[in-house]
Structure formats: structure tokens, C-alpha cells
């Protein structure tokens, strides 16, 4: 049964937390063009160029960084919107503009700390008594508070852009496991799987989250923060069920970039073999139920591992196109009244299965492999060492600006959050250099 929903959006979704009253002559840009410019010119975005997406052991400069991954996700995002406008023109007025979806894809990773998941786990452990740490929560915090475009509201993005960046619309206190593991005797013994963070918004940023969702009805607010089924164990985190239409498009673009483009990195860097591809992905893709994959999976494997750049690119492009053109807008299975929440972009079931196969393959053969995990573990130790040192004597070791922020806040959790903000903003190289300065016996 189709639901008739008005696509007239309240002007409140284009509002910013601060009116600003900027001195700009003849500025005819849309709110979302301005959002995109702020993200693109931010220090947080620039730092992504020195945060690696896949930690291989190659000396080449071919590999993707968080920045190139974000650029590719942005291109995919605008491609998804373009094909949706053609495929389902009735949603044209509801779909995000190119500038808006570009903004979301460019900004989606800016909260990720150095050393990927290793850095995230380390900061979450060190912040376990102070609200935790999580990359998506940090992204929201950067754009709403930390990036110094404005004095108090970060980049001061439009409300719709902020809603689109919130992948997990609930506070961490709501999604966090009932029980946490016991702290380890020594940080070297920390197991990453025990301290993977819950997903959501920091409780200390609740006022900003409340502002974003203020135009929603009480029923929509309650539904938006609804959890999936309660986990079986008290040590497992909860996850939210819903997200906005814009966020669903951004997430698909991110997943395709991860599942397909990171696969390309792994092949070029010699991290996966053709046999691994055949056993770990090709055989399952052939049985995923999608006619395109069933017909072309043999030639895709040949082209990916032919050693010829143009053939590999053709295979990658073919898979991306097959996934992208299988996306459509579908009604959400709960009665949201706001159209931004009532509809989501989804892959057809067979293609969703295919993308999961690709993501699992990348995780198993690219992320969870020995050499990558060694780099992540090393990064985990570097981040914990830095946090321990800086929190032990912040007035001595923090840089002047960060020290001032630390002194401005009153309670211990807020002070620890300042240190987490400082460390998470570092690039891989910055963290490594500071660690050497603090702990190396070599005179610098």
C-alpha cells in the first residue's frame, strides 16, 4: 500500500544554529552550496589526506587515503541522486541537491581518528568513564562545535545537512552496552573487539542534537531514536533502526566506495590473490541472485587480476554501475510524518547481498589481515600512550590553544573530552611524531 506524503519541506531545514550575518557581496549560493564550501575548506577535511584508508605495506603512493575515499564517495553520491531523479522523477523535489549530497559524503569521515579502528578503540577505552569515543559522534561534534568557522557552532551547517550526517540518531548512553568489560591491567593487553564503541551522539552534545531534530513531531523523534532488537548479551551495544533519506544515500555511497574501490587498492597493493577472490567473493557473487553478476562474474575476475590497469578499471566501473543502478527509493516501514524520514534509498535485495559479499571480502582479506592489524595495534598503543601522557599533565604538555580549552571546562569528563578532541584530530604522522618526541630515547 503506497503512502501519500507531501514533499513540501519546512524552511527550518535550511536554517543554521547561528544566523551569522556574514559580510558577503552578491552571494547567491544556496544554503547547501555554502555548506559544501565550508566542509571543503576546513582543516578537518584537509587532514583526511594524511589518514590512511587501507594500511598496506607498500611503499607506493597509489593507496587511498580517507580524503580520496571521501571524494570517491561524493562522486558516487551525486551519481546515485542523478539516477534516482531519472528513475523515480516523483521524488525529484525531495531528493538532496548535488551540493547537499556532496557535502554529506565529503564530511562523513572527518571524525575518524588516526590509525583507523585501532585509534578509535584506543580513544574509546581511554574515554570509557567519560562518555566514550566514536568516529561518527566525533564527526557531528566537529561540524557543530569544534571546527573554528564560527566561535561556538563549528561549521554552522544547515539543519538538513546535519540530519544527513547523523547515521545513528540516539545518544551513546542509549546505545551503549549495559555492561562494559573490566579495564585491562596494562594497555598492551587491550583486545580491540572488547572495546569497539557504541554508535550514536555524545551525551555532552545532546543540546545540538536536540536542535537538529527540533522541527520533527514528537512521534517522529521517538521513532527516529528507536533501537533494533535488544542484543542477547548485556555486553553488546544496541543500534538504531532509522536514518534520513539523505543519510541513506550517503551511506550507500560510502559502502560502495568501501566494498569496491578499497578492493581495487588491495589488488594493486598485492594484498589479495585471484584464488582468494574466487573463494572469498566470486563464488558467492555468482549465487547472489542478480543476473548481471551471474553473467559477468567470470570476466570480472579475469579483468581485475589481468595486471592491466584499464581492464581492472573497467571491471571496477562495471561493478559500481551495477550497484548504483540497483538503488531505488522505498517507503520506511514505520509511519513517519516527515518525508525526510518516511523514505530511504535502498539496494534491491540481490544487490544488497552482493555488496555485503564485497564488504565482507574487503574486511576479511584487507582489513583483518596480519600486516594491517599490526599497524592498527601499533596505532592503538600510540594513541593510548599519548592520552595517558597528556591527561597526566595537561597544563604542561598540551599546546597553548588546547590548554586554554582544557582550563575553560569545569568537570573531569569535559576536560578528558578536550584531550580526546585534540588527539583524534591528529593525522597518522602527527600522532607518530608526537609519540617519538615524548617517548623516544633518541635525542630530537
UniProtKB/Swiss-Prot annotation:
Q: Does the keyword Hydrolase apply?
A: yes
Protein name per UniProt = Deoxyguanosinetriphosphate triphosphohydrolase-like protein
Gene Ontology BP terms: dGTP catabolic process
Q: Which Gene3D superfamilies match?
A: Hypothetical protein af1432
Where does the source fall among the domains of life?
Answer: Bacteria
In what residue span(s) does the HD domain sit?
66-259
Matching entries from InterPro entries are given as: dGTPase (IPR006261), dGTPase-like (IPR050135), dNTPase_2 (IPR023023), HD/PDEase_dom (IPR003607), HD_domain (IPR006674), PHydrolase_assoc_dom (IPR026875)
Q: What is the lineage of its organism?
A: Bacteria, Pseudomonadati, Pseudomonadota, Gammaproteobacteria, Vibrionales
One GO molecular function term of this record is: dGTPase activity
Family indicated by similarity: Belongs to the dGTPase family. Type 2 subfamily.
Q: Which Pfam families match?
A: HD, HD_assoc
Q: Which SUPFAM superfamilies match?
A: HD-domain/PDEase-like
Q: Keyword annotations for this protein?
A: Hydrolase
- Coiled-coil intervals, chain numbering: none
